[in-house]
Amino acid sequence: PTSNASAEFIKATWELQCNATPVKYQNSLFQDLNPSHNHLSKVKLNQELWGDFIFNIDSNAFSLSQELSQGSQQSTLLNFLYFGVEHILTGYDHLLFILGLLVLFARWRLFLSITGFTIGHSLSLFLGSVGIVIAKMNIVEALIGFSIFFLGYEYFYKNFFLSRRQYFRFWQLMPLGILFLLWVLGIIGFLLFCGMTVFVLSYSKIILDDQEMVKPLLITAFFGLIHGLGFASNLSGAGFTDNLILGVLGFNIGVEVGQLLFASIAMLALALITRLFGVQALILSKHGISSLLLSFGIYWFILRML
């Protein structure tokens, strides 16, 4: 085999000659070390693309016959759709961000925020997967954590500190203080510190205006661009040049299906809490969720920058 290694993935090519059919191919490499590990594989039969496959702990084998009955395009779309659903439902940082949108927005603003997030991550997922946009994944993953932190920050900003003037200025300056401390400690660079400081100051102004319809869409679209680059890290460099568009499309549809499934369950749970225990229980639940957003968001940001 020939291989090419990088920080994010290992790419290897095998050529096998088998006289007997059907052929069963099994791949369980690294799964004893990391049960969540996935292999993205492009299979060719007699120099013709047979399909793109994903091997994981639950499905690590498939049978290959001379008849291309499944069709490479159909297998690519379905396999990557399943991969997208699995990725979003096991991506706890992405799920926590969606939960933050449910806590922060309601009715049409919730619809706009989820729409913006979908547009943003769909665009950057495609651009990152085809190699048009190349980003440092540790910074992308860290910024995903920071986006989660900011949903919790906005919730308490609007629902607690805005009506308590004695703490209001402290809450405004708190994220700037965190960024300054991380820069002094050498955890983040000067350019990242300056860029995020400008963002924090701008964001603090934007979130005070609840009357603007387009702002939830634009803000979550911006966050979606960051999350989409995180999604793209699962596909970039995999070498799916033949069915690249179908692979990205299937993965993105899978992410949307998983996202809607999780959002529906979470909304049902919040509605059930309200019905059984009253509005006060719902408010306490939102406080608790927003506290998780703050703590896990800043934890992931610092951890991924180290």
Protein language model regions, located:
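N-terminal soluble domains immediately following signal/targeting peptides that reside
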Residues: 1-86
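Acidic-enriched, low-complexity/disordered segments with a strong bias for Aspartate over Glutamate
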Residues: 32, 52, 58, 93, ...
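Active-site-proximal inter-transmembrane loops
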Residues: 75-82, 240-250
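Hydrophobic alpha-helical transmembrane segments in multi-pass membrane proteins
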Residues: 86-226, 232, 236-237, 243-247, ...
